[in-house]
A protein has these predicted regions:
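Extreme N-terminal starter segment of soluble prokaryotic enzymes
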Residues: 11-15
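Short, surface-exposed acidic-centric catalytic microdomains
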Residues: 33-74
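Short, well-ordered beta-to-alpha junction loops that form the rim of enzyme active sites
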Residues: 20, 106-109, 149
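Divalent-metal-activated hydrolytic enzyme cores
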Residues: 9-10, 25, 55, 65-67, ...
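Short, positively charged and aromatic/hydrophobic N-terminal segments
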Residues: 3-8
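N-terminal glycine-rich phosphate/adenylate-binding segment common to multiple enzyme folds
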Residues: 90-121
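Short N-terminal binding/cap micro-motifs at the start of the first secondary-structure element
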Residues: 23-30
Length: 154
């Protein structure tokens, strides 16, 4: 369930979800992060799948990216921050147009992580913080959960 700022359950009709959680093969390695609990939760709802990294033109498969000091960079050192932020802006416009109240995004992703992301050293080390899309949605006042939040409530 998703809750508003008053901790009231809201009835969700339209929701954005990280496409990889729905089984779309859009991960950096060409795979997915299919999450059966997410799929079950969104049954009967109008779902808009999103992948900022694909929308940014990074391709499938692609070189991994991480967020360090607010800049999105590939493992090979190429900065892709502008492309990611442009994709996030497009997603935000769609969210507003579609009147979406809630998002369920992929935990720890550099674009979609809500509570923690990898620290930008490409060493597998986590740090507190949100990915670019998650932070933009939170800043705009949307309810944003990651898939692990959903698992904790069920």
């Amino acid at each position: 369930m998703c809750y508003n700022a008053k901790n009231e359950v809201i009835a969700l009709k339209k929701i954005i979800v990280s496409a990889c959680l729905l089984g779309e093969n859009c991960k950096y390695n060409g795979g997915n992060n299919l999450d059966a609990q997410v799929v079950e939760f969104v049954k009967g709802r109008d779902v808009i799948p999103v992948c900022p990294e694909v929308l940014a033109g990074l391709g499938i498969p692609r070189i991994t990216i991480e967020l360090k000091d607010g800049i999105v960079t590939r493992k090979d050192g190429v900065v892709v921050d502008e492309a990611i932020r442009k994709a996030v802006t497009q997603i935000l416009a769609q969210v507003k147009e579609e009147d979406i109240e809630c998002a369920i995004l992929k935990a720890r992703s550099p674009t979609c992580g809500v509570h923690q992301i990898y620290d930008g050293t490409f060493s597998g080390t986590l740090t507190d913080g949100a990915g670019v899309l998650a932070q933009a949605l939170l800043d705009a006042g949307y309810i944003v959960w990651d898939n692990e939040d959903l698992e904790e409530t069920q």
